[in-house]
Amino acid sequence: MQKKQFDVNFFGAANTTKAVLPFMRENKSGRIVNISSVAAVAHIPFQTYYSASKAALESYTSCLANEVRHFGISVTAVEPGDICTEFTSARKKSAAGDDVYGGRISKSVAGMERDEQKGMKPETAGDYIAKIALKKKVKPVYAIGSVYKLLSVMCKTFPCSVRNRVVGMLYSGK
């Protein structure tokens, strides 16, 4: 499971970039928009590998932006929050370890599923991402939705202890 998270979320983007980058460098232009997640900065409990793979993608995005800027290539990451898709019903769940954590894993996942079902429509997220892709200049990172923008800024600016407490209250299944 852990390897699959990184294969899709990190290496999928890195390998795609590796394939297109020579053409972008040759043309001295291009835009790379990586799809991250607010989990990259929120470090969501019981979503360790997902959060870590998205954090790796954001770090990669920042490094790459500095490497290719002089070729006229811009790189950005988008941090969606919950999006209402069929992913929720297709999620493979395991009760392994739930007893060790006092049932907090299943409570946390149930809360995430509720949030996903109330999340934004995929079309809304897609429109937002398309607008970013077409901007003249891009910021390093964009969060989608006011709640997630606030959460992203809070996670990046507040002390880790505050971030961990807030994220823990939201997602730890207590």
Question: Each PLM stretch: what is its role?
Answer:
Residues S37:
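Residue(s) in the substrate-gating loop at a strand-loop-helix junction
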Residues M1-K3:
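Substrate-binding pocket helix/loop in short-chain dehydrogenase/reductase
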Residues H70-K139:
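SDR active-site lid
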Residues A19-K28:
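A short helix-coil junction within the Rossmann-fold of NAD(P)-dependent oxidoreductases
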Residues A42, C63-I73:
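Active-site-adjacent segment of SDR/Rossmann-fold oxidoreductases
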Residues A42-T48:
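Active-site loop immediately N-terminal to the catalytic Tyr-X3-Lys motif
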Residues T17, S53:
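Active-site helix of classical SDR
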